[in-house]
Regions:
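ATP-dependent small-molecule kinase phosphotransfer cores
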Residues: 23-71, 75-83, 128
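Walker A/P-loop
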Residues: 6
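Walker A (P-loop) phosphate-binding loop of P-loop NTPases
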Residues: 2
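Short glycine-rich anion-binding loops that position phosphate/pyrophosphate groups of nucleotides
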Residues: 70-72, 94-96, 141
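NTP-dependent small-molecule kinase module
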Residues: 11, 15, 61, 124-153
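A glycine- and Lys/Arg-enriched "phosphate-lid" helix/loop adjacent to the NTP-binding pocket
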Residues: 85-127
Length: 153
């Protein structure tokens, strides 16, 4: 959440000449609702199942950059599938930077659950994120993150 996955993903895809896909955006388009509305109307479990279905569509594709939501990247099954299909990058964001970036964003249902919940959620997700092939500190501008990533490819 709020690490810059979509922005960095688009920039990276442009640099590589690949196609960019944002799983959250695809889900919203297909459902005709925002993620917040999906959570409210059908629940988090339904949304997480949609994430996995959409991810499965990209596992066999080549020359794509895929941005996942933070919850999908924290799913151990999804992480293993992504790692076997391609390179997985973790944009690591410290909690204070996360709060600054997310403070004014609408449509993020998990942000409404309070600071203690968010801190615990980030700590729990990091256990799976650490399995990514590459870890980049996400406290720099998006173009600097892309250059840093390209230097590691």
């Amino acid at each position: 959440m709020c690490s810059g996955k979509s922005t960095v993903g688009k920039l990276l895809a442009d640099k590589l000449g690949y196609t960019f896909w944002d799983i959250d955006q695809l889900i919203e388009e297909r459902e005709g609702k925002s993620i917040e509305e999906i959570f409210k109307d059908k629940g988090e479990e339904y949304f997480r199942s949609l994430e996995m279905k959409v991810l499965e569509e990209f596992l066999e594709k080549e020359k794509v950059v895929v941005s996942t939501g933070g919850g999908l990247g924290a799913n151990p099954t999804a992480m293993e599938k992504m790692k076997s299909a391609g390179l997985v990058v973790w944009l690591d964001l410290d909690f204070d930077t996360f709060l600054r970036r997310c403070a004014h964003q609408e449509g993020r249902p998990l942000l409404k659950r309070g600071l203690d919940y968010l801190r615990a959620l980030m700590e729990e997700r990091e256990k799976v994120y650490r399995l990514a092939h590459i870890r980049l500190k996400a406290d720099r501008p998006p173009d600097a993150l892309v250059e840093g990533l390209l230097s590691q490819l």
